[in-house]
Structures are given as structure tokens and as C-alpha cells.
UniProtKB/Swiss-Prot annotation:
Coiled-coil features, chain-numbered ranges: none
Lineage, broadest ranks: Bacteria, Bacillati, Bacillota, Bacilli, Bacillales
Superkingdom, natural source: Bacteria
Main EC class the enzyme belongs to: transferase
Family in the record: Belongs to the UDPGP type 1 family.
Protein name: Probable uridylyltransferase SERP1770
Alphabetized GO MF terms: uridylyltransferase activity
Keywords: Nucleotidyltransferase, Transferase
Xref: Pfam families: UDPGP
Length: 395
């Protein structure tokens, strides 16, 4: 039985009323779930991230990151980086980590976003092709770690099976799930999903490293003598997966964190890679005043290489949550299905940067390496992604 006094203390007394409409099994399931939750922490999250939320307007401690521009590298520098990259890949120094926990909902597609196809080629296949090419060029089969979520894990694995893993060695593809966290109403109340369970949503890409560890894959990387983890996400159709030049740049620089960026456009709604108090980090566009965002020259595109030693030392350290507000379907007080603004709490992978001690960035040409697929129509859409893939002769 739910503790009514405890629920009232943390603004969750509506759950007591919900129980009156539930069967015995449903009540037991709700009781068990609520017992597992730290209601005080949930209330603190709500207060800190929603009630008292603010944007960043004091940039006195924020400066530009240390970066090099790819287009300014001479032929000798490019060749040297590429050769070092091929050598490191051949020697098994890199693992590839793909964040692919999302669905294709905003594309008008039911299924894992990575399985969305553009003229017959899925986002997963676009990346698998590049790993196959690296295998042909180096003789080494790179381990490919793919983070899914509860909402797409089974479908993702099934899609890979149906497509015979895109002719990549299935023994070198490793799937694991990110964790979840509860969602709240704008009043700070726990909500029920359409099945009558406490609604939980994926806890953001910042959980990637802990989930990787929980699955045993950080240990595997150490056993495989991996030195660097190349990280990217599923959204960017022009991503160069572990391109040898960037791999060589990473090895040569030998920093905890090596990043790729692009030159941002004014008022572009993309996070900025900046240096805060002598550490690189990403400030989300939603957390910055527009005039402040326009002061910085490196837009984050979610492509990085991390020293494995750094990740293993920092993986268990705490990261802050960030707020996202989404329209999600849920049960109302009469158990009818409604769609309402819902607070999602997300961890961001780049918050682990705060535990690093050395950083470097390579700014790359937007037109060659960045074309996000986010919408069905308009900006960053299926149309723009298709045009960019054709322009780069990728489909």
C-alpha cells in the first residue's frame, strides 16, 4: 500500500487516487515501482531544472577552445595524420561507439531511427559501409558498440539480423541499452504511461559510458588493448566514422578528449563547444542567450574520441541532468489517454568532459561532414539529407 503521507510530502498524492481505479495486480506493480524511487531526489530535480531553470548569460569564465582547422592543414600534415590513423586502426587501438537509442517518430517513421532508409540505404548501413571499408584497408575488424534503448532495442537487433549485419562480422557488433529515468508533469507529478505504469524515458546519451560498463564492454575494450573510443550518433548522415585523418590527429595529440566541430551559423540552434574554467565542454543552445552563443566559433556535432583510460577513470563520477519538455501520451485522472507537455530529464555525454585534463578540437567543413536528419520536412529533413548524400556520392 502506498504511504499517503510520504506521497503528500513529495507532491505525489495523485498516485493514491490512481490506485482506487486499479486492479490488485496494477496496485502491486505501482507500489513496487514507487518503493524503488527516491522521491526526494525527484523533487529536487524538478525544482532545480524546471522551477528554477535559467539560461547562461555570464560568460566571464567561458572562452574559445583550442582548435585546428582541417582545411588549413597542408598536404604533408594530412598525409601524416592519415598514415598514423591507419596504423592505429590496424593495431586495434580504436573501438567505435554509436549512440542510436532514438525512434524515427519525427520522420513520420515507426521504428529505430537507424533503420530509416534513404533511397534504400539505412542510416545504420551508411555507417557499416565505412567500417567495412576500414577493414578492407587495414585488415582489422573494428568492434562496433551500439547503444539502443528500451523502445528500440529488440527492433534494432532484428533489423541487423534481417539485413545480415550489412556484411559486417556479427561477432564484432555489440548492442547494449541505455538506462531510464522517470518523467514528470509540469506540476512535478509522476505520470502514468498508456499501460498504467510509472512513465520512464531514456536517460539521455550521457548514460552511455555507465551503460557500456554495466554491459561489460569497458572491460572487453581493456582486454582488447583498445586505447581510444570513437563516439558518434545516428543523426548525422555525413558522419565520417573513424576517418583515418581524425584517428591520426587523435593519436598524435594524445588528449583525454579529441573533438570534431564545425563553424556555426549565427543563431544556429546547436550546442557550442567552449572552454569553461580551463576545461572544454558543450553549452547547449537552449541554455545560452542567442547573443552569447554567436560569440563562439565551434558548433558541437557529437563526434569525439576519448582515451579509454580517461573513460574508465571517470565513468562512475556523477553527471548533472538537463531538462527537455516533450509532448507525450499518458493517462489522465480518469485513465483516458491524453497528450501533454512532459518533463524529461537527460544526461549529456559531454558533461564527462569536466573530469578530463587535456582537450583538442579539429574543425571540419560542414558541407563534407555534417547533415543532421531530424525532421520529416523543412530544415534538417529527409530532403536535405538525401540531397547531401547524393552530393557526396554516398547513395
Amino acid at each position: 500500500m502506498l504511504d499517503k503521507n510520504q506521497l503528500e510530502k513529495y507532491n505525489q498524492e495523485h498516485l493514491y487516487e490512481y490506485e482506487k481505479l486499479m486492479s490488485s495486480n496494477e496496485k502491486n506493480a505501482l507500489d513496487e515501482k514507487v518503493d524503488q524511487l527516491n522521491l526526494a531526489e525527484i523533487q529536487d530535480l524538478y525544482q532545480d531544472l524546471y522551477v528554477n531553470r535559467k539560461t547562461i548569460d555570464d560568460v566571464s569564465s567561458v572562452s574559445e577552445v583550442k582548435y585546428e582547422v582541417k582545411s588549413r592543414l597542408n598536404e604533408e600534415e594530412r598525409h601524416t595524420y592519415e598514415q598514423k590513423g591507419y596504423e592505429a586502426i590496424r593495431n586495434g587501438e580504436f573501438a567505435v561507439l554509436l549512440m542510436a537509442g532514438g525512434q524515427g517518430t519525427r520522420l513520420g517513421y515507426k521504428g529505430p531511427k537507424g533503420s530509416f532508409e534513404i533511397e534504400g540505404t539505412s542510416l545504420f548501413e551508411l555507417q557499416a559501409r565505412q567500417l567495412i571499408r576500414l577493414k578492407e584497408e587495414t585488415g582489422h575488424t573494428i568492434n562496433w558498440y551500439i547503444m539502443t534503448s528500451d523502445i528500440n532495442h529488440k527492433d534494432t537487433i532484428e533489423y541487423f539480423k534481417q539485413h545480415k549485419y550489412f556484411n559486417y562480422d556479427a561477432n564484432h557488433i555489440h548492442f547494449f541499452k541505455q538506462d531510464n529515468i522517470v518523467a514528470l508533469s509540469e506540476e512535478g507529478k509522476l505520470v502514468l504511461n498508456r499501460d498504467g505504469h510509472i512513465m520512464e524515458t531514456p536517460n539521455g546519451n550521457g548514460g552511455v559510458f555507465k551503460s557500456l560498463k554495466k554491459a561489460g564492454y569497458l572491460d572487453k575494450m581493456q582486454q582488447d588493448h583498445v586505447k581510444y573510443i570513437f563516439l558518434n550518433n545516428i543523426d548525422n548522415v555525413l558522419v565520417k566514422v573513424l576517418d583515418p585523418l581524425f584517428a591520426g590527429f587523435t593519436v598524435t595529440q594524445s588528449k583525454d578528449i579529441t573533438s570534431k566541430t564545425i563553424q556555426p551559423k549565427d543563431s544556429e540552434s546547436v550546442g557550442r563547444l567552449v572552454n569553461v574554467d580551463c576545461k572544454d565542454t558543450v553549452l547547449e543552445y537552449s541554455e545560452l542567450d542567442t547573443d552569447i552563443a554567436n560569440q563562439f566559433n565551434n558548433a558541437n556535432i557529437g563526434i569525439h574520441a576519448f582515451k579509454l583510460g580517461f573513460i574508465t577513470s571517470a565513468v562512475d563520477r556523477e553527471l548533472p541532468y538537463h531538462l527537455a519538455i516533450k509532448q507525450l501520451k499518458q493517462l489522465d485522472e480518469n485513465f483516458g489517454v491524453v497528450e501533454r507537455p512532459t518533463l524529461k530529464f537527460e544526461l549529456f555525454y559531454f558533461d564527462i568532459f569536466r573530469y578530463g585534463t587535456s582537450f583538442v578540437t579539429l574543425q571540419v567543413p560542414r558541407e563534407e561532414e555534417f547533415s543532421p536528419l531530424k525532421n520529416k520536412e523543412g530544415k534538417d529533413s529527409v530532403h536535405t539529407a538525401t540531397e547531401d548524400l547524393k552530393r557526396m556520392d554516398l547513395i
